[in-house]
Amino acid sequence: MLRAKLVDDPQIKYASLHNPLPTQLHAYVWPFLIIWPAFFAVYLSPERYDTYIQGQEWTFVWSGSIITAQSLLWLMTKWNINIQTLFTATKARSLDSAQLIKVIPVANAGSAEICPLHCDTMGGKKTFSFLFQKRRFLYYPERQCFAPLSYVLDAEPKPPVKVFQQAQGLTSKEEIDRIQHHYGDNTFDIPVPTFMELFKEHAVAPFFVFQVFCVGLWMLDEYWYYSLFTLFMLVVFESTVVWQRQRTLNEFRGMNIKPYDVWVYRQKKWQELTSDKLLPGDLMSVNRTKEDSGVACDILLIEGSAIVNEAMLSGESTPLLKESIQLRPGDDLIDPDGLDKNAFVHGGTKVLQITHHNSNGEDGSEKARKLSSGVPLPPDNGAVGVVVKTGFETSQGSLVRTMIYSTERVSANNVEALLFILFLLIFAIAAAWYVWQEGVAKDRKRSKLLLDCVLIVTSVVPPELPMELSLAVNTSLAALSKFAIFCTEPFRIPFAGRVDVACFDKTGTLTGEDLVVDGIAGLTLGHEGADVGKDGAHTELAKSANVPLDTTLVLASAHALVKLDEGEVVGDPMEKATLQWLGWTLGRNDTLMSKAAALAGPRTVESVQIKRRFQFSSALKRQSTIATVVTADRKTSKKTKATFVGVKGAPETIRTMLVNTPPHYEETFKYFTRNGARVLALAYKYLSEESELSQGRINGYIREEIEADLIFAGFLVLQCPLKEDAIKAVRMLNESSHRVVMITGDNPLTAVHVARKVEIVDRDVLILDAPEDDMSGTRLVWRSIDDKFNRDVDPTQDLDPEIIETKDICITGYALAKFKGQKAFSTLLRHTWVYARVSPKQKEDILVGLKDAGYTTLMCGDGTNDVGALKQAHVGVALLNGSPEDLAKIAEHYRTTKMKEIYEKQVSMMQRFNQPPPPVPVQIAHLYPPGPRNPHYQKAMEREAQRKGAATLATAGNQTEHIPTITSPGAQALQQSNANLTPQQQRQQQASIAAAGFADKLTSSMLEQELDDSEPPTIKLGDASVAAPFTSKLANVIAIPNILRQGRCTLVATIQMYKILALNCLISAYSLSVIYLDGIKFGDGQVTISGMLMSVCFLSISRAKSVEGLSKERPQPNIFNVYIIGSVLGQFAIHIATLIYLSNYVYSIEPRKSDIDLEGEFEPSLLNSAIYLLQLIQQISTFSINYQGRPFRESIRENKAMYWGLVAASGVAFSCATEFIPELNEKMRLVPFSTEFKVTLTVLMIIDYAGCWIIENVLKNLFSDFRPKDIAVRRPDQLQREMERKKQEELETQAEKERQRKV
């Protein structure tokens, strides 16, 4: 027996094995091989025909029913994967006999598929595999399941470091062939289907088929114009969706890194290969490429270091230093997410620079540099790395896969939609039953009766629903892109409207990256006569000029900054700020020099050269370096070389490494953290004071030896200014029924200080943490910020209710670990405001805990340390470090590139028709050489010079050689065409110059179409972060309220669509039954006018923009509540009552006909005209009354298209009811009305509208549930302060207006 879990992968929910059936045995074929011959046997025999079919119309009914049934069975196989396997395949008994595998992924991870199974016997071993969503799954007999291809790094436990350090690459042809067969090429092959292939896929979607079926029924009922108009709208909409998908797939295809040449060590020698032939296990040279391409796969560096830009992956543009594992202890296990995180160069990142350390040689000579495995160095002098993952399994590959498969199609909440349709179906079946009963009683034609019943039932399923949902989500995507926010998983946008808890990282999210160094504290610890605070803290801060030599050396050496060949220093902004404050500069080869003439003390520092780094790790909370320090005696100028160790890290961590902890150590660093500063402890020791240790000796040390027996060198105190919009953004969230929480790896005292500044906490805070003096690791205490309150806590017991009610809570990662799994854990999560000193894994646990408690969560982080938490949240937002200026440059570059593409297309098109190329558009004239075809060249060069701040160009001719011209075929054609012109060609040229204005306009209009901002943007690499479904390119915290506004806007749009569609469906069910049996018909023109009105209104609804602020009121989370269902039924009752009253009133004037001809042509009558106008006003009221505007979206008056559309339609309705414009009544085929009738009809229309308005507003005020969840409820004192603040702001605004008026 096969295991229940056939495929072991978190993205796959279920899988089963199958064998295909022959086509003739498919469920939509074999029954009809019997049915069709039987039908024709009856049809072709006159006797049987008269007995069983009895007439032409029943022939049509029977044949139509069989065709519909067969089509439906076939279509069901396209709609549901389970039905497809049931109808077209049988279950396989074993893996050996199976040919197919059905794979169903988890929700929102793409579509289910039936994949062919492949069986290979390479190397004499039988292997089974299948390809699903571009991933190869292999069968592992020992685990009895399929799993994605496993790589060395996927093994548990992880392999030792020496496996990679001693890697020899792929050594034999057999091994290369085997691995090539197993893993395939290193490519992202994204096939782009043709327009017709994609359209076929869309054309069999349930709603599209249903709509076409309805159109067919309307045609049978002879509503030709209306049917053709609807069909045209459907095809156009589906075509635009298909075109959009095709464009997106083409963009994804462009993400593939073009193959380029790389040096690879295979079969014991270095050889050049193209990057698409790289295989896992290859040894390759990592270097900056000629093409400046991204790295082609995921690589683990085993020699050398690289400076890389990961903007294409994480979106972060700050270059990072990646260092090899060459000096890591060989027996340690590789730690890809921790210690060795900085040794991995991921696919898609760009290498900016490579450096080598003289690894093994005592003499430090270049010749001595070699790998521990004995492999010679690459010919291009690059760093050496082991290929660990290729193709779609790389970081970039998985990002592209997420983009492709999570965005396939946005769907409604399927369970809710299904229940909603079933609810409407009750009314439709009742109406259809009424029509059938009445029709049978009057002996009506059965075929027409059946058609009417089917029309009634189908009218209940709102076919616009998926279209409307797509429109609403796409509108939100387009709106977010204007704020530089991109989304890879659009189905998450409605979640943003339901968010209860918003969690923020601190550093780089609420606080800025541009840190300010305040000074060095703690230098006087243990000295007499120092400034001491009440609690013993040494509050004095030393400036850079007064910092002792050893402290200076720690600051100058303990960092990961690197200087690029171009001269730019790259790395952590905090470390840049520190070095700048110190007055030191970083040169080549990790050498640092002091700008200052001299430092205090008997010796001056000549230079510091970093020899080895132990990079910062969030798990270890420290970093260290070994450096050679050259000092000179002030008197004798004698130079001395020493080997120095500099360490910096969290004060609590460094404390355990000191030989002697000075008195008041803790009080001093806590004094600064309480005041919101970021504090790092500094420590050092000398490995040798009089001589320089060789590189070999330095490389022999392990991290634990280096980071022990240290001497304290002070506290580095930095201020992290809040981002400009942090307070405003958090206040908006607090005041709009959200709970805001901070989750940070920083010190709890600093975290609480920042939380108070941004108004996350506003009461006294208690910190749940280990006691300071406890080394046992078992105790927990509540302690206040000033340490005056201390109380022991037992994690196995419930929390003290008094503390929860009266204090704000901060908890550390240590305490969180103690509470995890205990019964009080959920209570703790519910009441905690600040989480400090938590690891990335704990951030994830917090989000999972909040989700399990039933809250909708948002996490906002920086996209590098918060990946797990960002993925776990319902709405994960990565804030990148871009500025508006950066975005303006990117947008300008994008426009120029697009313009160039369009112009190149025009040039090649003209060439095809043997016409001269069009003039170069003014926007890109500076990219082409001067000449008659480039009339705007001079102007463009002046514009570019001004833009770059240069002097205006004197002449274009002098600058020609400096211009970056393009050498595309179009540009070459342009250059060639200007030479050796004949008189006739000159005349053509003059004509083309005359056409320059037209060409410019044409290109501009094409560009505008390309950049149509109402379209949802196509995500490109660099827009999205691997970490999160939402990415803000700007570092502004206000991105969060913007996302929540769009989420609420989409949620409100979805719910109001349900209401409007429900009312329309219920009214049409009544119209098609009771009204229809009374002989009331509408003209084709009348139906088309009302259909167009609905289309315009639906389009306008989905395009309504969100309002600026966030309201305290929350949108309805779902449609099944007393308010929404009550409102729909109440409005429906009003509509029915007015329709019944009007028809009875008309019968009192014109008696009812005894013989109603239901099949007759449409003829205007008093009843037809009156009912049409009443129904028109009912449609208008449905849209206008159920439109949800403020406080979530712009009001109906602000939604201009909808407002004027409804005003125009109301004008038409009332104008016709009052016969204000008689000609209009004639055009619309309405009969004349008497004065009394006009008054009655107009009053009834007003009553209908007013009644619905009253019902909607009464139920909204009585039953709508706008309350936030318990976690987001504000206390009375907070609400009071909020009111007072708003009053004060209003007074200040009025005073300012008054002042300006007087001025």
Swiss-Prot record:
Any one GO BP annotation for this protein: intracellular manganese ion homeostasis
CDD domains: P-type_ATPase_cation
EC number(s) from the headed UniProt entry: 7.4.2.-
Transmembrane segments: 25-45, 57-77, 201-221, 223-243, 415-435, 1060-1080, 1082-1102, 1122-1142, 1201-1221, 1239-1259
Region annotated P-domain, chain positions: 484-513, 724-883, 1020-1035
Region (A-domain): 158-191, 256-408
Induction cue: Expression is induced by ER stress in a UPR-dependent manner. Leads to the down-regulation of genes largely associated with the metabolism of carbohydrates, amino acids, nitrogen, and sulfur; as well as genes that encode abundantly secreted proteins.
Sites where the protein binds ATP: 505-507, 616, 678, 746, 862-866
Disruption-associated phenotype: Induces acute ER stress.
Highest rank taxon of the organism: Eukaryota
Main location, first listed in the record: endoplasmic reticulum
Annotated region (Disordered), positions in chain: 1277-1303
Keyword Membrane recorded: yes
Residue numbers binding Mg(2+): 505, 507, 862
Activity regulation behaviour: The ATPase activity is stimulated by phosphatidylinositol 4-phosphate (PI4P).
Cofactor(s) this protein cannot do without: Mg(2+)
Active site, renumbered: 505
Sites where a glycan is attached: 287, 474, 589, 734, 958
An example Gene Ontology CC term for this record: endoplasmic reticulum membrane
Region (Arm-like): 884-1019
Single GO MF descriptor: P-type ion transporter activity
Region (N-domain): 515-721
Stated family: Belongs to the cation transport ATPase (P-type) (TC 3.A.3) family. Type V subfamily.
Record text about domains: Contains a large substrate-binding pocket that recognizes alpha-helical transmembranes, which alternately faces the endoplasmic reticulum lumen and cytosol, while remaining accessible to the lipid bilayer through a lateral opening. The translocase alternates between two conformations: inward-open (E1) and outward-open (E2) states. Undergoes a series of conformational changes with ATP-binding, phosphorylation of the Asp active site and subsequent dephosphorylation in a Post-Albers cycle (i.e., E1 -> E1-ATP -> E1P-ADP -> E1P -> E2P -> E2-Pi -> E1).
Job of this protein: Endoplasmic reticulum (ER) translocase required to remove mitochondrial transmembrane proteins mistargeted to the endoplasmic reticulum. Acts as a dislocase that mediates the ATP-dependent extraction of mislocalized mitochondrial transmembrane proteins from the endoplasmic reticulum membrane. Works in concert with the ER Ca(2+) pump srcA to support ER homeostasis. With srcA, also supports redox homeostasis and virulence.
Protein name per Swiss-Prot or TrEMBL: Endoplasmic reticulum transmembrane helix translocase spfA
Organism name: Aspergillus fumigatus (strain ATCC MYA-4609 / CBS 101355 / FGSC A1100 / Af293)
